[in-house]
């Protein structure tokens, strides 16, 4: 059955000098309003144990605009400023619900520069987008068309560290489920092989960062040789950002193609609930694990399975997938990472990764059949339940990566 989802379509655009200046001012004002509101909420929370609502923050913004030193806030569109306060409200709601850490201040150099416009702050006419406080429509490079008849409800403009400008259009889209199939696959994440499938196929890790490591190192050396605060250092930093952007784009493209293929070919996809944050504490493997981007792959699998009528099952991270003999069910005592093949007492010879993928699939199918839980829990291994089923949230709960 077809379903309606909110989907973001991201495009690159090239602003005029006037548009770039206006948007840069807007980015600065958005960052200032966010940080001042966060400062006020922090004083209220840590000083008085008092929570500040969005309405109170919005009233404070009105007062700021009346002061002489912050009168320039009235020169940009008010909608991005209000949206910044809404995002801060969401950040605090997640903090109080213990879903995230305490909100952090936005940095001019490190944070992504962005501004969000709702329907009242932009004009969409004949496929052209004009933002508030700008006279001309944006010069957007339409790399793919919007859904037929779709109109954006929210527009987010951003600029990355490499100096590239992007616009993201949030639209309603109709998703048709993929044709049903009986195939199922278990996925074991790795470093040498990015993923190993229960079919025995190994997807080689492209190692995107390593391909540009020499270029990145040279660009970083150039930065270190420039005087701090100089224009040349700023140019050198932008070159570093361009290399990072190249790596990120290449990685994202590969993961999208891989996740789409896995979802299209299989009715059930089973993965492990890996805690990447803890794995990154391994100094020798941290760079390789970060480059593999397992979390990003999982995120793509989650929303694509939800879109196309597939089932995603996540088994417990403590399930001994590599040490469990898929033939007799015996669990081996120790299995160091350097051991890629091992022989069970029953005589079965196992490839470490293929055996793990097959055990993951078997555990996932068992969890799917019995409906064992909703979300992975660390305690499940102590209570004898080695795997659980996870129902991914619908894409309408947030904007997926595209």
Curated annotation (Swiss-Prot):
Zn(2+) binds at residues 325, 328, 344, 346. It is an enzyme of class 3 (hydrolase). Pfam families: Cas12f1-like_TNB, HTH_OrfB_IS605, OrfB_IS605. An RNA-guided dsDNA endonuclease. When guided by an RNA derived from the right-end element of its insertion sequence element (IS), cleaves DNA downstream of the transposon-associated motif (TAM). Cleaves supercoiled and linear DNA in a staggered manner 15-21 bases from the TAM yielding 5'-overhangs. Binds reRNA, an approximately 150 nucleotide base sRNA derived from the 3' end of its own gene, the right end (RE) of the insertion sequence (IS) plus sequence downstream of the IS. Keywords: DNA recombination, DNA-binding, Endonuclease, Hydrolase, Metal-binding, Nuclease, Transposable element, Transposition, Zinc. The keyword Zinc applies. NCBIfam families: guided_TnpB, IS200/IS605 family accessory protein TnpB-like domain. Its EC number is 3.1.21.-. This is Putative RNA-guided DNA endonuclease. The keyword Hydrolase applies. It comes from Streptomyces pristinaespiralis. One of its GO terms (molecular function) is metal ion binding. Residues 226-239 have a biased composition (Basic residues). It comes from the Bacteria. Disulfide bonds: none annotated. One of its GO terms (biological process) is transposition.
